[in-house]
């Protein structure tokens, strides 16, 4: 699973997920999976989508993951009263804004890429769309 090796602080405020995304262009591969909605992806969801894509392309081509879960999410244990401090870090998430390219792929045909991204999109909690690299 993806998570930072070390961080400046163990726990962070909840914060808000507003604004527009950076990394909106397909820059490494030829095809991409772009977020249409806003939300957050857990490290498990990112990995599940990656596995689905890798199996769909039968390990051909190359896949780039353009998101990284760098925000810790804390949870209190079951049946624990409120108060007594913030809970323990349970998992890591990446905050996603509309327009962010999540995955990229190269070395496969468009049909295979579309199929692989469709399988990956089924594993993700946000709406996505298929994009291709624009050459200028």
From Swiss-Prot:
GO terms for cellular component: cytosolic large ribosomal subunit. InterPro entries: Ribosomal_uL16 (IPR047873), Ribosomal_uL16_bact-type (IPR000114), Ribosomal_uL16_CS (IPR020798), Ribosomal_uL16_dom (IPR016180), Ribosomal_uL16_sf (IPR036920). Keywords: Ribonucleoprotein, Ribosomal protein, RNA-binding, rRNA-binding, tRNA-binding. GO terms for molecular function: rRNA binding; structural constituent of ribosome; tRNA binding. GO terms for biological process: translation. SUPFAM superfamilies: Ribosomal protein L16p/L10e. Gene3D superfamilies: Ribosomal protein L10e/L16 (3.90.1170.10). The keyword RNA-binding applies. Belongs to the universal ribosomal protein uL16 family. HAMAP family: Ribosomal_uL16. Binds 23S rRNA and is also seen to make contacts with the A and possibly P site tRNAs. Part of the 50S ribosomal subunit. This is Large ribosomal subunit protein uL16. It comes from Actinobacillus succinogenes (strain ATCC 55618 / DSM 22257 / CCUG 43843 / 130Z). The lineage of its organism: Bacteria, Pseudomonadati, Pseudomonadota, Gammaproteobacteria, Pasteurellales. The gene is rplP.
